[in-house]
Curated annotation (Swiss-Prot):
Record-linked InterPro entries: Aim3 (IPR031370)
Start-end of Basic residues biased regions: 36-54, 877-888
Start-end of Acidic residues biased regions: 59-68
UniProt-recorded name of the protein: Altered inheritance of mitochondria protein 3
Coiled-coil positions: none
Domain of life the protein comes from: Eukaryota
Modified residues (Phosphothreonine): 718, 850
Assigned GO CC terms: actin cortical patch; membrane raft
Species whose genome carries this gene: Saccharomyces cerevisiae (strain RM11-1a)
Compositionally biased region (Polar residues): 166-244, 341-354, 453-462, 752-763
Region of interest (Disordered), residue spans: 1-315, 341-795, 818-893, 908-936
Name of the coding gene: AIM3
The entry's keywords: Membrane, Phosphoprotein
Segments of skewed composition (Low complexity): 93-105, 130-152, 245-267, 306-315, 622-632, 656-665
Length: 936
């Protein structure tokens, strides 16, 4: 408490002050942050809008100022961008002109600066400042080029020359280099050496001065003695002898290397010894010096090379000055610089000395008196500016303009996109497109000859070959490039082209539709004759006659295609319905009913011919001879097919019934159920014929109607009465059994009918409407029976045949006792329809399934106790298939019976291998296709 009371005020005041300043600080920070974020957002927004082409006046103006500042910096750095223009080789000659412009501009700064240096050189260390001045002048000449490239290379001359380009920075670099030159100058401690070496070296003075100071200490005194006087006068005349010397320093180095010494040759090896050495080696051809200078640095090559070219030209005149001064190399360098500085005398001298490669040789020989002449004219310094610029156009008149273009670099200007070089191809050399010309020529040339040929020739065949031959000649003419012929024949060619195309495509349609039968015969007759009399009207109307020609071929092709289609269509119509019926029945009664199958085969070929005739006139009203030949061919083909078709297809149907009874039941059961109903009804009401023609006429026009009649004739006499009684009895049983199991019983009810009555009694097939409940009762029987049927079908075909024959004779009632006696044998049990056997089978099967009563009515022969366990297994396996059969039973009651016939005959042997494949055939492949494949 005491602490708080004592310090409460101070604490509160401190907290207040802290909170106050903290608030102020946070407020300030928040404001600044908000402003910065807003500014940044505006900048980014302005940039985005600029990209999109939008502009916000307020934000962008505010932002543009900042951006302009950022952009102004690169504009300030335009000097850096200028070297970008320099690096390309064309800038080498153009740099002179570019530097000349800059020199024109720079002389204001450089000249003043150089004059300052010169004046400084005069009052100060004459040689050093002379070199400074000479360097500015030399810089004035290659100003910009030497600025950037030379300064880094540290040919101080070039580097300093670059500073003159930017007079301030150049002054600094120039001053720094003169400082270097000064120590170098001080190192020789010879004004003449410094002036000469610095002049000779220029900014190379570091190179030459360092090298010349070390290598030329002795010549420097002599050079000092003679040159200093001359150099200063030259400095006076050129603005600075050192300026002349330093400005041509490369030339001086070159010449001093020869004169001053080839001692100075090590000096060229100095900071920019390479350009100078190259210049030294190349001073003879100053253009070479220009070319070589770019290698060390384009600015060097530009400034130095320019000076070399001009100063080298000046060097020849300056070399005598060097000689006059006593150091030919240095003196020559001075004159070169002087020429660079003073373009009047230097240019005059440069002409003799420019071409004179003996710059190095001339420095020793060079006349000294010319030096004072150049030393005297100081005004040429401005002349140098003017002269340097005119000299540049004189030397670089060709390349001056591109540099001028390059110099005004716009940072905002979009970067030039690289141009894609597209190879130019001579159109004349290329061959004309043969396809177009050929087509045009064929069209052009065909119509005229076609028009000529058609009136002349009466046969279309003659006109066509003539057209082709002429088209070939037309192609040759196309290659020759006869445009007049094409133009002249263009209209007729179009007509001829239409004649050809119209002959083929347009007319055949009307002929097909309107004149199918008659024109087809006429066209066939004319096909041999080629419609000779028809051609003249074709000549009158060119397009229609070719259509008639096209009609011959196309109608014939269409007739052939229609015939093929007709043949295929009736075959497809015949195959699906009769095959399933015949197949299922034939395989169910293969051994027992070989003769009925043969009768079917006999009946079918005649009917397919009728069906073919019925189908052909609709499809082929065009020609009767073709329809007859096609119908005969179909008959022969169908005669060959039915036997093969009957045997293989029942397997797929049975298999399909076994695997998917639903699909196969619809396809197979339709005819089979018709047979079943026809048989049962024929036995009872003789309705099988009426029912069969319905389904069979829908599927098979003539066969099925006759085939079921043949089957009924064979089977009907035996079953009628017993079938009715058994059907009634089985109907009651099945009605009772319906409550127990639908799917399993349905299967069981179907197989007994299939086994005993497969080909014998249609009476058992007649109850299919009651069969719906029957399959429920029949499931047990079906499970038992199909195994027995499979055993019998596999190894006991003869017994089955005998049983079926007995059943066909309606011995079922009579045979009930016999069948019971025969019940001990599985074969007899399968064939015996006795209800006692059925009871036994139900008892054997009823171990798992009830009741015993329903089986005795129908499935007694089919239900065999030994096979029952397998059928129980089958029941376990088949119930998933049974639900599919239930809807089928609802839709087609008679079908499941016959399907189970085929199912009972084939399932046991073919379920394992063929069920999935059969399902696939049922669902995907049409049954007709399957039969055809089997036939194949």
């Amino acid at each position: 408490m005491g602490f708080w009371e004592n310090n409460k005020d101070s604490i509160t005041s401190g907290l207040k002050s802290a909170g106050k300043y903290g608030y102020q600080g946070t407020k300030y920070v928040a404001k600044t942050g908000y402003k910065a974020s807003k500014k940044h957002y505006n900048n980014s927004k302005a940039r985005r809008e600029r990209k999109s082409g939008k502009k916000n006046s307020s934000d962008e103006e505010y932002e543009s100022e900042d951006e302009m500042e950022h952009e102004r910096k690169p504009t300030d750095i335009r000097s850096l961008k200028d070297p970008k223009s320099f690096p390309p080789p064309p800038l080498k000659p153009g740099q002179k002109t570019y530097t000349g412009q800059q020199q024109q501009q720079m002389p204001n700064g450089q000249a003043s600066y150089a004059f300052q240096g010169a004046y400084q050189g005069q009052p100060g260390a004459g040689s050093m400042e002379q070199s400074q001045y000479a360097q500015p002048q030399y810089n004035q000449y290659p100003q910009q080029q030497l600025q950037q490239g030379v300064m880094p290379q540290q040919p101080p001359i070039y580097g300093e020359q670059v500073p003159p380009y930017g007079s301030n920075s150049n002054a600094t670099s120039y001053q720094s280099l003169p400082q270097q030159n000064q120590p170098q100058y001080a190192i020789p401690s010879q004004v003449s050496l410094n002036s000469a070496s610095q002049q000779s070296t220029g900014f190379v003075s570091q190179n030459l001065q360092y090298g010349t100071q070390s290598s030329n200490p002795a010549p420097s005194p002599s050079f000092q003695n003679g040159l200093q006087c001359h150099q200063q006068p030259q400095y006076v005349s050129h603005g600075s002898t050192n300026l002349g010397q330093s400005q041509f320093p490369s030339g001086q180095q070159q010449q001093p290397t020869t004169q001053f010494g080839q001692q100075v040759l090590p000096s060229p090896a100095q900071p920019h010894p390479q350009p100078q050495q190259q210049q030294q080696g190349q001073p003879l051809p100053p253009p070479r010096g220009q070319v070589i200078l770019p290698a060390p640095g384009e600015p060097l090559s530009n400034g130095f090379g320019q000076q070399q070219q001009q100063p080298l030209n000046q060097n020849n005149a300056l070399l005598p000055q060097m000689n006059v001064e006593g150091v030919s190399g240095m003196a020559a360098v001075q004159p070169v610089y002087g020429q660079a500085m003073s373009s009047t005398t230097n240019m005059q001298d440069s002409n003799p000395s420019y071409g004179a490669s003996p710059m190095q040789g001339q420095p020793p020989v060079g006349g000294q008196p010319p030096v004072p002449v150049r030393m005297q004219p100081q005004p040429p310094q401005p002349m140098q500016q003017g002269n340097i610029y005119p000299i540049e156009p004189s030397l670089d008149s060709t390349s001056s303009t591109p540099h001028f273009e390059v110099t005004p670099f716009d940072p905002d200007a979009p970067a030039p996109k690289p141009k894609i070089d597209i190879p130019t191809v001579d159109v004349s050399s290329l061959p004309p497109p043969p396809t177009h010309r050929d087509r045009g020529a064929v069209l052009h040339q065909e119509p005229a000859p076609s028009g000529k040929i058609q009136p002349n020739t009466t046969s279309s065949a003659a006109s066509l070959p003539a057209k082709h031959s002429r088209t070939t000649t037309a192609d040759n003419e196309r290659n020759s490039g006869n445009k007049e012929n094409d133009e002249s024949t263009s209209k007729s060619s179009i007509l001829g082209h239409y004649d050809v195309d119209v002959n083929i495509m347009p007319p055949p349609k009307p002929f097909r539709h309107g004149l199918d039968s008659v024109p087809s015969e006429h066209t066939r007759k004319n096909a041999s004759e080629r419609a000779v009399p028809i051609l003249p009207p074709r000549n009158n109307v060119e397009p229609p006659p070719p259509p008639s020609r096209g009609n011959f071929e196309r109608t014939e092709s269409v007739l052939s295609t229609n015939a093929a289609n007709v043949q295929e269509d009736p075959i497809s119509n015949f195959l699906p319905p009769p095959k399933p019926f015949r197949h299922t029945e034939t395989k169910q009664n293969q051994n027992s009913k070989a003769s009925p199958v043969e009768i079917k085969d006999e009946v079918l070929p005649g009917h397919p011919s009728e069906e073919d005739r019925n189908v052909e006139p609709s499809l082929l009203p065009q020609s009767k001879s073709q329809s007859q030949s096609q119908s005969q061919f179909r008959r022969a083909h169908m005669e060959t097919q039915p036997i093969q078709n009957f045997q293989p297809p029942p397997k797929p149907f049975r298999r399909s019934q076994s695997s998917n009874s639903s699909d196969s039941s619809y396809t197979i059961d339709g005819p089979e159920a018709n047979h079943g109903r026809g048989r049962g009804r024929i036995a009872k009401h003789h309705d099988g014929d009426e029912y069969n023609p319905k389904s069979e006429n829908s599927t098979e026009n003539g066969r099925l109607g006759d085939a079921p009649n043949s089957f009924i004739r064979k089977r009907a006499p035996t079953p009628p009465a017993p079938s009715g009684s058994e059907k009634l009895h089985e109907g009651a049983i099945t009605s009772e059994v319906d409550s127990s199991k639908d799917a399993n019983k349905y299967e069981k009810s179907i197989p007994p009918v299939t086994s005993s009555i497969q080909a014998q009694q249609s009476t058992k097939k007649a109850p299919p409407p009651v069969v719906k409940p029957k399959p429920r009762n029949f499931s047990l029987k079906a499970n038992e029976y199909p195994k027995e049927l499979t055993r019998e079908a596999t190894g006991q075909d003869e017994v089955l045949n005998s049983i079926t024959n007995e059943l066909s004779h309606i011995k079922l009632r009579k045979i009930n006792v016999n069948l019971e006696k025969l019940g001990g044998s599985k074969k007899v049990k399968d064939s015996s329809p006795v209800p006692s056997d059925l009871d036994e089978k139900y008892v054997s099967a009823s171990g798992s399934i009830t009741p015993p009563r329903p089986p005795p009515s129908r499935s007694s022969p089919k239900k065999v106790p030994p096979v029952v366990p397998k059928k129980n297994d089958n029941l376990k396996k088949k119930p998933p298939v049974v639900p599919k059969k239930k809807p089928l039973l609802k839709s087609l009651e008679p079908r499941p019976i016959e399907m189970e016939r085929a199912y009972s005959g084939d399932i046991s042997a073919a379920d394992d291998n063929l069920n999935p494949f059969e399902r696939y055939k049922r669902n995907v492949v049409p049954q007709e296709d399957d039969r055809l494949h089997k036939l194949k």
